[in-house]
Design a protein with these regions (language model features):
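A short SAM/SAH-binding and catalytic strip from SAM-dependent methyltransferases
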Residues: 105-118
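Short alpha-helix
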Residues: 160-175
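Conserved Class I S-adenosyl-L-methionine
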Residues: 182-240
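Short, glycine-/aromatic-enriched active-site segment of Class I SAM-dependent methyltransferases
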Residues: 139-158
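A short acidic, Gly/Pro-enriched loop at the edge of an enzyme's catalytic core
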Residues: 94-105
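A short glycine-rich, Lys/Arg-flanked "PGG" loop and its adjoining helix->strand segment in the class I
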Residues: 119-133
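Class I SAM-dependent methyltransferase SAM/SAH-binding core
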Residues: 41, 47-95
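Conserved alpha-helix/loop element of class I SAM-dependent methyltransferases that forms part
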Residues: 17-36
Length: 240
């Protein structure tokens, strides 16, 4: 079944969304000063490329949150290899079991869309300390008239996707201030799609039919043809 092929393709990928170590480092600097031992949540952590780096850079109490337990097992492996401690929690991001006012830094690279941008901003705000900060990356239209193929692809998976002005307005309505905005470079997409494309070829060599791989390959093909129409933007936010 297609879902099984999806998980086989995504097993052991270094990341589950566009990004890079350089981008994570930059966004952490843009987040500003944190307590000496901050409470950090990496929500929708995937296999933990940002989680482990955040633990190394902040020296904080870092927890990776994801619903897919094999991803969390990989987080634990990566943390052990890096000689840092990272907690893991299998939980839904729309019902995080943390006390109000307990989180200094909530990190969400490529995951807020799962519950929706506006819903994420509303649900996560009460968790923050008075000086807490949210760092997230969000898929956005960079064209007011994207190609029909790109529109059809994203409408199927994320029909609520907006432009940057639309998200900036939503952030203001939700009572947040924007500390920084950063558009992820093309190299960050390559970091995600390069390993995914290689994994697809491995599955093809193992005998998985092309028609079952097509759905996994589609997002790469759409990006190659219409990448100018959309991108990922990082927002560093504080409650007003």
């Amino acid at each position: 079944m297609t879902e099984d092929v999806f998980w086989r393709a995504h097993t052991d990928l270094p990341r589950e969304a566009p990004g890079s170590e350089a981008t994570t480092r930059l966004l952490l600097r843009l987040a500003g000063p944190l307590p000496s031992r901050p409470r950090v949540l990496d929500v929708g952590s995937g296999t933990g490329p940002a989680t482990v780096l955040l633990a190394q850079l902040t020296g904080g109490d870092v927890t990776a949150v994801d619903r897919h337990e094999p991803f969390l097992a990989r987080v634990t492996e990566r943390a052990k290899a890096a000689n840092v401690h990272v907690g893991t929690l299998a939980a839904s991001m729309d019902a995080l079991p943390f006390a109000p006012g307990s989180v200094d830094l909530l990190w969400a690279e490529g995951s807020a869309y799962i519950m929706g941008f506006d819903a994420a901003l509303a649900a996560w705000r009460p968790l923050l300390t008075p000086s807490g900060v949210v760092v997230l990356t969000e898929a956005e239209w960079s064209s007011d008239a994207p190609a029909p193929e790109a529109r059809a692809f994203w409408d199927a998976g994320y029909p609520a996707m907006r432009t940057m002005p639309g998200n900036v307005a939503a952030i203001a309505r939700a009572g947040w201030s924007i500390r920084a905005v950063y558009v992820l470079p093309d190299a960050d997409w390559d970091n995600y799609y390069g390993p995914l494309a290689a994994r697809i070829e491995e599955l093809r060599a193992e005998g998985v039919p092309d028609d079952r791989l097509a759905a996994v390959r589609e997002e790469i093909d759409v990006r190659e043809r219409h990448g100018a129409d959309y991108g990922y933007t990082a927002y560093v936010l504080r409650p007003r």
